[in-house]
């Protein structure tokens, strides 16, 4: 099999990339606030996973879904939590 494989072919017309970027943009607020050591770790792992393994934001979010969900609930960030859960239900 030659060429690249698009593992998101079933997500055609779902805007998964834009939706993932929106969630990451909202998570950036938590990363910048640095109120929990996890956020620095998450930012570092995101960079590593993207650069070294070629993973996109949807996959990075999926890798940390339970922790992200818990922290967003604890912080009362229900809007970002809803966006994350929508990604989970529709695209993960």
From Swiss-Prot:
It holds the Pfam family CowN. Signal peptide: none annotated. GO terms for biological process: nitrogen fixation. Keywords: Nitrogen fixation. Is required to sustain N(2)-dependent growth in the presence of low levels of carbon monoxide (CO). Probably acts by protecting the N(2) fixation ability of the nitrogenase complex, which is inactivated in the presence of CO. Belongs to the CowN family. This is N(2)-fixation sustaining protein CowN. It comes from Rhodopseudomonas palustris (strain BisB5).
């Amino acid at each position: 099999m030659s060429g690249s494989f698009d593992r998101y072919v079933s997500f055609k017309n779902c805007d998964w990339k834009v939706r993932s970027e929106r969630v990451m943009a909202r998570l950036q607020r938590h990363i910048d606030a640095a109120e929990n050591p996890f956020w620095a770790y998450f930012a570092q792992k995101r960079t590593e996973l993207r650069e070294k393994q070629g993973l996109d934001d949807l996959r990075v979010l999926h890798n940390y879904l339970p922790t992200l969900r818990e922290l967003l609930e604890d912080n009362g960030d229900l809007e970002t939590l809803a966006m994350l859960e929508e990604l989970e239900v529709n695209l993960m």
